[in-house]
């Protein structure tokens, strides 16, 4: 499950609280029933109270579609990037409210697939976990490439900039192209 880099997994279900707690414990989402709350208990909370308590709960049981939207919005108000998965018409409003809505491709309804930002073709949660990991690797690689290019080319940029200010030519365009070819191509192969 996505536990690295402060990813929080939350289970929101229409199932009975005891069932949801048992599944949550089995999956390692929660350690005890105090981390679960029901839709009826959510009704008693104002939006401000929910905002204060949303991080305390990882399992939400017996919830209605409007509860799911409230939960997603509470996480968003906390500054979290939210992703919501679902397959039924009742999941569509919360999938639409989330930053990233994920519909199920096999069991999902057409409504859910249409409002989703992404459709999971195999209905497998592990695919989402793998995609998040791959996305993080791509992001890290892009960041490293930009750092390398800035670091390796900064001397060229500064040299040409100050030479231009002082009124003389430090490097011709052909020289710059040759330097870039040598310094940027070989490290790119690694």
Where do the model's predicted regions map?
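Residue-level "edge-of-site" marker
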Residues: 14-17, 37, 88, 108
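Acidic, divalent-metal-coordinating active-site segment for phosphoryl/phosphodiester hydrolysis
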Residues: 16-27, 66-71, 88-98
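Short, small-residue-biased leader/transition segments that mark boundaries at the very start
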Residues: 1-6
């Amino acid at each position: 499950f996505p536990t690295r880099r402060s990813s929080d997994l939350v289970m929101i279900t229409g199932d009975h609280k005891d069932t949801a707690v048992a599944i949550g414990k089995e999956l390692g989402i929660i350690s005890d029933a105090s981390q679960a709350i029901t839709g009826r208990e959510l009704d008693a909370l104002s939006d401000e109270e929910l905002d204060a308590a949303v991080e305390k709960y990882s399992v939400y049981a017996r919830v209605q579609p409007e509860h799911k939207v409230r939960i997603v919005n509470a996480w968003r108000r906390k500054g979290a990037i939210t992703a919501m998965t679902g397959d039924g018409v009742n999941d569509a409003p919360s999938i639409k409210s989330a930053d990233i809505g994920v519909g199920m491709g096999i069991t999902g309804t057409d409504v859910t697939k249409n409002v989703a930002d992404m459709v999971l073709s195999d209905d497998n949660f592990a695919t989402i976990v793998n995609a998040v990991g791959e996305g993080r690797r791509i992001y890290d690689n892009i960041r490293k490439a930009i750092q390398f290019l800035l670091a390796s080319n900064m001397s060229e940029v500064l040299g040409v900039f100050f030479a231009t200010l002082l009124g003389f030519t430090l490097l011709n365009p052909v020289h710059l192209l040759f330097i870039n070819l040598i310094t940027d191509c070989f490290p790119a192969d690694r």
